[in-house]
Amino acid sequence: TGKMIWYYQTTPHDINGHEPARSIILANATIDGVEKKVIMASTKGDYAYILDAATGELIHEPISFGAQKINIYNSNKGNDADFLLSQEVIVDQTYCPGAFGGSSTTSAFADNILFVASQNYCTKFTKGQVIYKDQLIDGYQIETTQEAQSSSVHAIDVSTGQIKWTFPIESRYQGGITVSSGVVYLVDISGNFYALDSETGEVLKKIPMNGAGNAAVTIASDANGDMRIFVATGGSKSGIIAALGLPVVDSSEDDEGISRRGLIGSLVLTSIVGILYLLFIRYYRN
């Protein structure tokens, strides 16, 4: 019919810019032993929402994750939100998560676990001149604070709404999350590639790719039908796409797709890619 069935507003009268970003997932999940179709979303304000897809009702209370929340207004307030607030209340104030999140990238879901990434990143809100229709007018500006910036990845048990584990990352994280066969794949803005155990968060592999990671790792087959892990990095440096080979799984062993042991062995190829990349950069700069 084209008519709205339901809606759920995460942050009424949002003055911090903490909307859900690219993170909405529709999937079947097990809740209290019963399979149910759910909607999962995370916001730039570092809250995760798990909703009944049929009704829009919350299955769990909003799940808070990430670093501390400072000068944040109207998150999870519903009809109790202060609709008279203006952005004047945060002028000359530092607020966290900042204007860019928080959780601002694509999340992932597998084996009843929701994986979300959060940037521990604050911004300051000030008044100033901004360009509007080729003219300078009075407006608001966002400034980056001088504090160290880091990130964290969180695994949330969808059946309970509890955080299973948290993995800290030393730099900002703007790429999406990929999960396959019990392995979580990440690449941060400093170019570090990670493979984590999806159940425990244990690091299976960490490889420097020497370029900013701003996109999710992709798993697909090449023209020959061989499975590959594709890692894109670049930023201000020359960009590359590294194609990493996956191991052939012996059918006599457990049939879990990409085995962790095989993963660790196969990703040795990445070291070769990294060395060749460094040689290329040195040659290019000279």
Give the ranges of each region predicted by the language model:
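Juxtamembrane/start-of-transmembrane alpha-helix segments at the extracytoplasmic/lumenal side
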Residues: 253-269
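Short, aromatic- and cysteine-enriched interfacial helices/patches
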Residues: 240, 258-259, 284
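Sequence-pattern detector for short linear motifs
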Residues: 231, 263-264, 285
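Small side chains
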Residues: 155, 195, 262-265, 274
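C-terminal membrane-anchoring or membrane-association module
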Residues: 273-286
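S-adenosyl-L-methionine-dependent nucleic acid methyltransferase catalytic domains
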Residues: 59, 271-272
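Extracytoplasmic/lumenal domain signature
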Residues: 1-20, 25-37, 41-103, 108-174, ...
